[in-house]
Swiss-Prot record:
<keyword id="KW-0812">Transmembrane</keyword>
<dbReference type="InterPro" id="IPR025428">
    <property type="entry name" value="Spore_YhaL"/>
</dbReference>
<comment type="function">
    <text>Required for efficient sporulation.</text>
</comment>
<protein>
    <recommendedName>
        <fullName>Sporulation protein YhaL</fullName>
    </recommendedName>
</protein>
<feature type="region of interest" description="Disordered">
    <location>
        <begin position="48"/>
        <end position="70"/>
    </location>
</feature>
<keyword id="KW-1003">Cell membrane</keyword>
<keyword id="KW-0749">Sporulation</keyword>
<feature type="transmembrane region" description="Helical">
    <location>
        <begin position="3"/>
        <end position="23"/>
    </location>
</feature>
<keyword id="KW-1133">Transmembrane helix</keyword>
<keyword id="KW-0472">Membrane</keyword>
<dbReference type="GO" id="GO:0030435">
    <property type="term" value="P:sporulation resulting in formation of a cellular spore"/>
</dbReference>
<dbReference type="Pfam" id="PF14147">
    <property type="entry name" value="Spore_YhaL"/>
</dbReference>
<dbReference type="GO" id="GO:0005886">
    <property type="term" value="C:plasma membrane"/>
</dbReference>
Length: 70
């Protein structure tokens, strides 16, 4: 049954284990990256909304100032 020395089988098991850990770490890193991207996207959307509100209120103020010519 043993065609190779025991240490060869141990190396093969080590390679398989390393590949498994590599895939698991890559998936975990992808989750962390996705969470970071979503957080940064939410911050960006909040900034855009605040800027839109600021411009809208600024535009309304300018319209009100233009109408009250005395």
């Amino acid at each position: 049954m043993l065609f190779f020395p025991w240490w060869v089988y141990l190396c093969i098991v080590g390679i398989i284990f390393s590949a498994y850990k590599l895939v698991a770490a890559a998936k975990e890193e992808e989750k962390v990256d996705q969470a970071f991207i979503e957080k940064e996207g939410q911050i960006y959307m909040e900034r855009m909304e605040k800027e839109r509100e600021r411009r809208s209120s600024q535009q309304h103020e300018e319209e009100n100032q233009n109408h009250s010519i005395a």
